[in-house]
């Protein structure tokens, strides 16, 4: 039996969307295509530059931190104070779900870390010294969210421009039910990306796929 043009067109449209989703590196069409990037605008991949190199090193550091946390958890290695603190945050967060989980991690890490000048360091180093700047807070939250079970494709690091202070800043964006929530060391309030557009201009996006620049 032949199909109607409407049904054929609908299936073709679904096929095109699926192909586009695959090209974008998404895990499936359930991640809404118009909203796969926090703060909305399209982004352009960065193939080279300081941040690309930094992020490559940070991803390697996250793997090392993950192995160190696992060793502390299962192998009984000494000097695990930082890992134990991080694991407590993660386990307590797992008592919650969805927005409540990411809100817990945002608040817990904001309270555990003291504001201080900092650099790009791994999550365990952040918890070892318990201080750092927005990068340290963001890396620690990004790592904790992944360990708490949030899929990598639903996490982003976003470098933004704070319009009020005329300075660059880093936050974490976490997607829950197709809504991007912003984890920010400047506030305990968990607001959405759209609620932050008056305050922040997005500049760069960092995730498992690499570095992208907002157009």
Model-derived features with residue positions:
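A structural boundary/capping signal
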Residues: 2, 9-18, 25-215
